[in-house]
Amino acid sequence: MAASASAAAGEEDWVLPSEVEVLESIYLDELQVIKGNGRTSPWEIYITLHPATAEDQDSQYVCFTLVLQVPAEYPHEVPQISIRNPRGLSDEQIHTILQVLGHVAKAGLGTAMLYELIEKGKEILTDNNIPHGQCVICLYGFQEKEAFTKTPCYHYFHCHCLARYIQHMEQELKAQGQEQEQERQHATTKQKAVGVQCPVCREPLVYDLASLKAAPEPQQPMELYQPSAESLRQQEERKRLYQRQQERGGIIDLEAERNRYFISLQQPPAPAEPESAVDVSKGSQPPSTLAAELSTSPAVQSTLPPPLPVATQHICEKIPGTRSNQQRLGETQKAMLDPPKPSRGPWRQPERRHPKGGECHAPKGTRDTQELPPPEGPLKEPMDLKPEPHSQGVEGPPQEKGPGSWQGPPPRRTRDCVRWERSKGRTPGSSYPRLPRGQGAYRPGTRRESLGLESKDGS
């Protein structure tokens, strides 16, 4: 009973409830109080402070919410002070306000100090009723004689900057409204049109565009840049480095790289003559002269491909009068100009050699070989089957020459039935008489020996 009586007497002596009632009668709805459980938990007092501008809200550019946590030992203990939702104040200003309010609280220990703390906060805001920071549109600070405005959400802009922003947003909203007109007509629920919003917090803006446009444009101070000695030294060093890299090809020219594959059609290139083209006037020359000119021409030698390992071609003398000289000349030119092609079949023509003395060696293992008829008269000397190099229209095997007189690849072998015409004296069923075995020029066991003798003689 005695403890409860002492607690009741202590609560009656506590000055906080009576002080809160006085504050509520002064600030009315601006003050919010969260009462604790007697003296066991602290009370919390919230109040939003503005500069004293004779209730002219348009001239109030700064504000903050003051929070006081009153302990149970109040007034013999200082309340905990904090600031929430500051507008137009820098961090340094907020820190200064907290320090000033702390000094006031310590000076009023043992007495009612809540009213003094609230009024001191208002006084500081009145003295600093200039927004601190930058215009978020132009990113420049506010000067004393510049025309700026404050939104209901306590964000600050130059009047000229805000007018330009509002005009731009109205044009965008108009364009979006035209695009979404059909969607709004078919929509079941009508969406409320959204006006111009604050560029910081997206709250709807209330503005007078005419008055904002009439405001003068803010004059920003022009700061002349003066490089220091260190910056000038660095510029010279980078300039020398750039020149050195450019001389060594380390700098990529974007314009040159962009136009590397650009083809201009204003100046057409000169028509290039085909390298494989042969003058028509050379057609009247004999094949030997034409072959010599083609072999000595550097253009033809550079364009012709390297010779391929093809089988040696053997061309026998044809019966004179079978073809005209003009056709032979055309075939000679075609064989010299066309590159050699490998054989399409799986087999390759075996290499044949014509040894000296007129002996003709046939490949081993061939059964259906055609032998030449015996001569009518006695054979006085061996007949050389090699054609003359300057015979008209006759193609011979390529002759081996020095390394500096290469005449191109050997002519391509063409399977032309016209070149191997049947003689007029032969009939479809006739054949050449065969020689007895062992009496011909062919010796089965002497092929390798004859080849070895040729290599030793160097012929």
From Swiss-Prot:
Q: Where is this region: Disordered?
A: 268-309, 322-459
GO CC terms, sorted: cytosol; cytosolic ribosome; nucleus
Quote the subunit structure annotation. Answer: Interacts with UBE2D2, and may also interact with UBE2E1 and UBE2E3. Interacts with RELA/p65.
SUPFAM superfamilies associated with the record: RING/U-box (SSF57850), UBC-like (SSF54495)
Q: Where does Zn(2+) 2 bind?
A: 153, 155, 198, 201
Residues engaged in binding Zn(2+) 1: 135, 138, 158, 161
Q: Which protein family is named in the record?
A: Belongs to the RNF25 family.
Name it: E3 ubiquitin-protein ligase RNF25
Q: Please state where this protein is localized.
A: Cytoplasm
Effect of changing residue 165 to A: reported as: Decreased E3 ubiquitin-protein ligase activity, increased binding to UBE2D2
Q: What does this protein do?
A: E3 ubiquitin-protein ligase that plays a key role in the RNF14-RNF25 translation quality control pathway, a pathway that takes place when a ribosome has stalled during translation, and which promotes ubiquitination and degradation of translation factors on stalled ribosomes. Catalyzes ubiquitination of RPS27A in response to ribosome collisions, promoting activation of RNF14. RNF25 catalyzes ubiquitination of other ribosomal proteins on stalled ribosomes, such as RPL0, RPL1, RPL12, RPS13 and RPS17. Also involved in ubiquitination and degradation of stalled ETF1/eRF1.
Involved pathway(s): Protein modification; protein ubiquitination
| Compositionally skewed regions (Polar residues) per UniProt | 282-303
MF-aspect GO terms: NF-kappaB binding; ubiquitin protein ligase activity; ubiquitin-protein transferase activity; zinc ion binding
Give the EC number: 2.3.2.27
Any one biological process term the GO annotation gives: ubiquitin-dependent protein catabolic process
Task: Supply the gene name.
Answer: RNF25
Native organism is Homo sapiens
RING-type zinc-finger residues: 135-202
Give the superkingdom in one word: Eukaryota
